[in-house]
């Protein structure tokens, strides 16, 4: 039997009883990082309440196998479905497997080979941040992690805002972001969604948990003077009516080289990138003249 287990996103007390029961009886662990999973089991075993009810939570005769985005396909190509006749747990470093973490390819494998599996509910930053945002909408769009590079990130934001333009009601967008790119992402969001409100959550469930709410520019100002180390969740409220053409017009106003702008415009409009490139060059030449 294959189990997808939620792990605490910061507070060890958020582990569930069902997860503890499965952890105690599993023989094999497929882990995003084996070191992190072993440490989690060690910490759980040190808790007197947990160790009393689950004395074998950190039994030594376990097999820990790395399973992450860099090796998942190779791993699945090498094993036989009979491998899953054992009791096997799938664990990410924190939160729910398959939710911006390894696991989805394994679910697909289980479905393809008619394997039994179970997904246990539990802690995750996505729903925790949305519920903490105070935005009244009962739905949200999950965008996961944005691209690392600014031009790809801006294009992704434009596409998301364009998609939301066709919805009748407000739909908050939830992003995950690292501290290394947080301020850059906020600058891009402010350029493309200026005036919109944002809820930013730092280090959810941890000792230094912090909430910020306001217009994007206000949060940028606050965070430029703050310690931003830690994991972040951003919830953007598209409270203004966005016209479908907004994405293209916003793109054309960006201070980008003509070649990059042409490629991004081509991706949005299905036009020829080379023709658009020469068109942008002519426009810039006219402006200079």
Curated annotation (Swiss-Prot):
Give the matching InterPro entries: 4pyrrol_Mease, 4pyrrol_Methylase_sf, 4pyrrole_Mease_sub1, 4pyrrole_Mease_sub2, rRNA_ssu_MeTfrase_I, SAM_MeTrfase_RsmI_CS
Alphabetical list of SUPFAM superfamilies matching this protein: Tetrapyrrole methylase (SSF53790)
GO CC annotation: what is one? cytoplasm
Sorted alphabetically, which keywords does the UniProt record give? Cytoplasm, Methyltransferase, rRNA processing, S-adenosyl-L-methionine, Transferase
Q: Name one Pfam family in it.
A: TP_methylase
Recorded catalytic activity of this chain's protein: cytidine(1402) in 16S rRNA + S-adenosyl-L-methionine = 2'-O-methylcytidine(1402) in 16S rRNA + S-adenosyl-L-homocysteine + H(+)
Q: What EC numbers are recorded for this enzyme?
A: 2.1.1.198
Gene3D superfamilies the UniProt entry points to: Cobalt-precorrin-4 Transmethylase, Domain 1, Methyltransferase, Cobalt-precorrin-4 Transmethylase, Domain 2
* GO molecular function per UniProt: rRNA (cytosine-2'-O-)-methyltransferase activity
- Assign the protein's first listed, main location to one coarse class: cytoplasm
Q: Does the keyword Zinc apply?
A: no
Q: What class of enzyme is it?
A: transferase
Where is this protein found? Cytoplasm
Instruction: Please verify whether the record's keywords include Repressor.
Output: no
Q: Which family does it belong to?
A: Belongs to the methyltransferase superfamily. RsmI family.
Q: What PANTHER family does its record include?
A: RIBOSOMAL RNA SMALL SUBUNIT METHYLTRANSFERASE I (PTHR46111:SF1)
State the function annotated in the UniProt record: Catalyzes the 2'-O-methylation of the ribose of cytidine 1402 (C1402) in 16S rRNA.
Protein name, please?
Answer: Ribosomal RNA small subunit methyltransferase I
